[in-house]
């Protein structure tokens, strides 16, 4: 691993960024990996590498899948990690997208291999995406936490220092490895209501993508995702209404959430939303 280099103060135009998400412990509701899949589609990403699953996975934990083609031939699909690359339409920046399953073993070697691919594409900033189950109501905006081990990024991008202590997943290990490697590193975490933690969770995916858009200063086409998020919330509303105990629990979560928040929206949040609106408007005109 290379010697640590001074981290830049912010992702600079023209310098590559790696965004990564992993199925498993770090991916409540499938929200983080769904965000990577969405970016892969809207940015027209091209596959550039697959990691050998033999090195990192216990196939009794993550079993391969057998599929049948139209000609009846059997194919085995192995659990693996895939790397794609894309060029952002507005800034021209190169982005690497990483999607995989949290490995069963050799996490340090796994991170080193991902960072070798990052070096090949001149990646300066590594952004890990995650989602966790939390005591939050589905009727309120999805809480999103952004943390960084890179001091220069904390003030520039309005992210918090990394303060968590306790068990971690591959997201935390990769974030730390990236910082040790000399990359700026940021971790984005969405809080998914624990009582509806099964995939999909489009409202949480939408929250993650909005923060990615802010981070890269690049409009992200959302397609049907906003409508999917509304439909998801409506569906949960209907389910909660059928069970008085769940409905009361949701009301308690709403009261706790509303009490904890400031009575007025923060200036930073308003500014971010306005900047996002301008980027999408300009992108629509240029398109």
Predicted regions located by residue number:
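Internal, conserved structured core segments that host functional sites
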Residues: 93, 100-152, 174
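Short beta-strand segments
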Residues: 20-21, 99-100, 128-130, 189-191
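Flexible, glycine/proline-enriched loop segments at strand-loop-helix junctions
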Residues: 22-26, 97-107, 157-165, 195-199
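A conserved C-terminal secondary-structure "cap"
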Residues: 196-287
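Conserved active-site and cofactor/substrate-binding residues in soluble primary-metabolism enzymes
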Residues: 27-34, 105, 109, 165, ...
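N-terminal short beta-loop-beta anion/metal-coordinating cradle
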Residues: 1-100
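Catalytic cores of processing enzymes, dominated by hydrolases/peptidases
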Residues: 135-219
């Amino acid at each position: 691993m290379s010697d640590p280099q001074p981290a830049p103060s912010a992702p600079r135009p023209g310098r590559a960024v790696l965004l990564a998400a992993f199925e498993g412990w770090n991916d409540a509701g499938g929200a983080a990996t769904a965000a990577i899949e969405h970016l892969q589609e809207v940015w027209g990403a091209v596959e550039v590498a697959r990691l050998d699953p033999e090195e990192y996975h216990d196939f009794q934990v993550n079993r391969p899948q057998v599929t049948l083609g139209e000609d009846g031939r059997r194919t085995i699909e192995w659990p693996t990690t895939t790397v794609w690359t894309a060029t952002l339409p507005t800034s021209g920046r190169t982005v690497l997208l990483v999607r995989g399953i949290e490995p069963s073993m050799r996490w340090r070697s796994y991170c080193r291999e991902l960072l070798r691919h990052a070096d090949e594409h001149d990646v300066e900033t590594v952004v890990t995406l995650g989602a966790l189950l939390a005591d939050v109501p589905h009727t309120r905006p999805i809480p999103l936490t952004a943390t960084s081990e890179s001091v220069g990024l904390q003030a520039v991008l309005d992210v918090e220092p990394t303060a968590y202590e306790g068990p971690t997943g591959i997201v935390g290990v990769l974030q730390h490895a990236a910082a040790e490697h000399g990359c700026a590193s940021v971790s984005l975490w969405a809080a998914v209501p624990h009582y509806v933690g099964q995939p999909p969770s489009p409202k949480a995916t939408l929250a993650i993508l909005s923060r990615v858009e802010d981070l890269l200063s690049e409009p992200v086409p959302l397609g049907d995702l906003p409508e999917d998020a509304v439909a998801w919330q409506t569906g949960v509303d209907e389910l909660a209404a059928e069970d008085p105990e769940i409905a009361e629990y949701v009301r308690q979560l709403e009261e706790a959430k509303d009490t904890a928040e400031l009575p007025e929206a923060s200036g930073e949040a308003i500014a971010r939303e306005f900047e996002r609106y301008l980027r999408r408007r300009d992108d629509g005109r240029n398109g």
